[in-house]
Design a protein with these regions (language model features):
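Phosphate-binding site recognition
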Residues: 1-176
């Protein structure tokens, strides 16, 4: 039987991402230790189960390679589904996204067993997808079974930057 293991599951929580110690060691090795605070702002924030302060390995390795801060991970795929869900979403989704972009948190139910058909105009399904994809992180959870109520925020500056660009793109494509 298949078992659903999500970002909120403790199983395998030590198997994903780089820890803060690993990142600090890598920064020192590359002579970039003075950038630790900026690296944390840009690429830290992932949570797997009860493990927090997990760094995105793709973004860290790209940063170590280039020495430049950029949106590496979020640009590895098309975010068109996310774009469509937020742009075409309810006013509640847009207001919550505005709060997230301002650094606030949102509280919502999460369904870790969502299916694609549930995404249309269902804010809890949208937040569930964003959490599962790594765009949101859990700040606090009260979990019961497959779901629960969660307090969520954007994962890090890289994600925040991606959403800002996405929303700015909506207005850049408007002809008056």
């Amino acid at each position: 039987n298949l078992e659903i293991v999500t970002t909120t599951s403790n199983k395998y929580s030590t198997s994903f991402g780089f820890t803060e110690e690993e990142v600090r060691n890598a920064l020192q090795l590359f002579g970039l230790q003075d950038q630790a605070d900026n690296v944390k702002k840009w690429y830290d924030g992932f949570c797997f189960g009860n493990k927090s302060d997990i760094y995105n390995p793709w973004s860290i390795t790209k940063y170590l390679d280039t020495g430049k801060f950029d949106s590496y991970w979020v640009n590895t795929s098309s975010n068109s589904l996310i774009d469509k869900l937020i742009q075409g979403g309810t006013s509640d989704i847009k207001i919550a996204m505005e709060d997230l972009l301002e650094g606030k948190t949102i509280e919502t139910a999460i369904d870790e067993e969502i299916i694609f058909e549930q995404l249309e105009n269902n804010s809890a399904a949208v937040w569930s997808l964003l959490l599962a994809c790594g765009y949101l992180k859990v700040n606090k959870a009260s979990k019961d079974g497959a779901g629960g109520n969660y307090i969520l925020s954007l994962t890090n500056f890289e994600v925040q930057n991606m959403f800002r660009r996405m929303i700015q793109g909506w207005f850049g494509n408007v002809s008056v």
